[in-house]
């Protein structure tokens, strides 16, 4: 925490622990009490505004800490996902998947590998017979 946040937190604690009027003391009339209350409020306001930007009221250190703390959104997300369960027709899901398979390179590779496998299967069959190989062997190696 920064020093300014610590200072503001201490000021808030000091203001809440300020000495209160003793029950035995009673003011003569209501108007001076209002004036003193207003004067105290203005003084505390000026003290708070002293360490902040002009016209901006300082925020409490606790509120700043809670705002910056990580929040767990798991419960809210699970509630949303379970409440929004809707079945979509198979044709719609297939259409969405097909639209997402556009002209990306990864999609092209899948299409090419399927074609290569088919070509390899065609190439596995041979045109030459065993007699042709033996004839070639005799002619080439001379045995």
UniProtKB/Swiss-Prot annotation:
Keywords: Citrullination, Nucleus, Phosphoprotein. One of its GO terms (cellular component) is small-subunit processome. It is found in: Nucleus, Nucleolus. It comes from the Eukaryota. The modification Citrulline is found at residue 7. Residues 20-66 are annotated as: Disordered. The modification Phosphoserine is found at residue 86. Its main location: nucleus. One of its GO terms (biological process) is ribosomal small subunit biogenesis. Widely expressed with higher levels in submaxillary gland and epididymis. The keyword Plastid does not apply. One of its GO terms (molecular function) is enzyme binding. Citrullinated by PADI4. Part of the small subunit (SSU) processome, first precursor of the small eukaryotic ribosomal subunit. During the assembly of the SSU processome in the nucleolus, many ribosome biogenesis factors, an RNA chaperone and ribosomal proteins associate with the nascent pre-rRNA and work in concert to generate RNA folding, modifications, rearrangements and cleavage as well as targeted degradation of pre-ribosomal RNA by the RNA exosome. Acts as a chaperone that specifically mediates the integration of RPS19 in state post-A1. Direct regulator of SIRT1. Belongs to the AROS family. Part of the small subunit (SSU) processome, composed of more than 70 proteins and the RNA chaperone small nucleolar RNA (snoRNA) U3. Interacts with RPS19; the interaction is direct and mediates the integration of RPS19 in state post-A1. Interacts with SIRT1. This is Active regulator of SIRT1. It comes from Mus musculus.
